[in-house]
């Protein structure tokens, strides 16, 4: 039945084609019948699968395949059976025929399952009870396989497809041979046995046990259900599907270490599961054992999810589900028993300063808080802005990672910083002004205004300088007038020195040297006022008075020269004052 459920026609007991791993092996039952045609390989597969013929028909034999298909095979002569077997295979297989599945199901054949799962291999023996149940030696297939272990066979062979084939088979066997079922049931754990096949056997076991439990209920059909139940198994069957099929093809599960580990896992699973009537739940199957009629449609969402898990996940998480912290629950965002969704850290957005944690319902987030940058972040951003006012995307990503900020925050900070920079430098806001102030030529007018503003500021500075220089000149005029009245170049030199312009002291004599008349007057003044000069060398006023008194000679030429010199001196003073102002202004 399960074979049908499995989607295998009866004929294809061995729908092991997937199991063809065994193809290399000489088919136990050369598929003479069409049913076996693919199953040839499969059959042999079964040998390798072991669990095909062994598990189901010779479940043990096959099982042993895992451990040693041949042994299992021998278990049922089937293994040895030639093609004729194949043709009869159904009968044989199903027949008590040497199968008599007595074949030593007791042997690890059950391994058949184990073979499939590759779990039990050695432990099969240990499990044999389970497997046996599963495969149940008890059924000593005498059931007569006629009934057809076919179905068994199917299971067995198909089972491979479903991995727990062995287990399933055992169920089928059970189905056929309630006795077998009983064992499975006993596997309550029986399922455990069959389960052994599956998930590390345990799951499968439970499945079988489960079915066994059911199984007894289902009877033959149940058996098929069991296999079918590869749903139960299905985690096994589907999940383990490949691995089981691949007892040969998947070296990883077939390695000695892999088999030993699987065996250990199975032992643990069975030990833990057998005592509990609800192995399936403990194993993470969570099938409802109370539903005698539950078939594939009866699986809950979580059960379906469980089917998708890999054997390794099953092995590691079977016992964790009740705790609610199994990987599968996390990965599948399973709900807790309260129906509340668990929010794991990986489901949350990475925390970034100023960004919501994702703990609010969409649309209900509070107003975004103003992002508070740390001093370190601001320092780094200012450094970068100092060198580049505009960031490339690559550089922006680098800064975002180093400062633990989002790219968007970096981008906005730089936009704001550029606006601040333009404001500080009194530059036009190109972002908003560009659209309004574009000339017919497309040139932004603000750019044209820049020089005008600077020029205006320069003009203002020059005007201020001129005003200040004029004020200074007005203050200097009385002294200069005295110089003019004195008609003395010497006094001009004194005035210039009094104004703090030593550079111009030599200028007076140098300029006067070009004028012979002025030279004469200097000598005259010195001669005439020699007495006064000797007495009052440091008295400028006395000098001026003497000069005024002594120089009433009315030399117009000299007076003209003095005026010219005065104008030159004034221009020099103005320039000098401007230079000083420029320095102070800066």
Curated annotation (Swiss-Prot):
Transmembrane spans: none
BP-aspect Gene Ontology terms: anterior/posterior pattern specification; embryonic brain development; head development; head morphogenesis; negative regulation of transcription by RNA polymerase II; positive regulation of apoptotic process involved in morphogenesis; positive regulation of transcription by RNA polymerase II; posterior head segmentation
Alphabetically ordered keywords of this record: Developmental protein, DNA-binding, Homeobox, Nucleus, Transcription, Transcription regulation
Pfam family, one: Homeodomain
Motif Antp-type hexapeptide boundaries: 343-348
Biased composition (Acidic residues): 318-331
Entry GO CC: neuronal cell body; nucleoplasm; nucleus
GO molecular-function term, one example from the UniProt record: RNA polymerase II cis-regulatory region sequence-specific DNA binding
Location (main, coarse): nucleus
Superkingdom: Eukaryota
DNA-binding feature ranges: 366-425
Record's compositionally biased regions (Basic residues): 92-112
Protein known as: Homeotic protein deformed
Source species: Drosophila melanogaster (Fruit fly)
UniProt gene name: Dfd
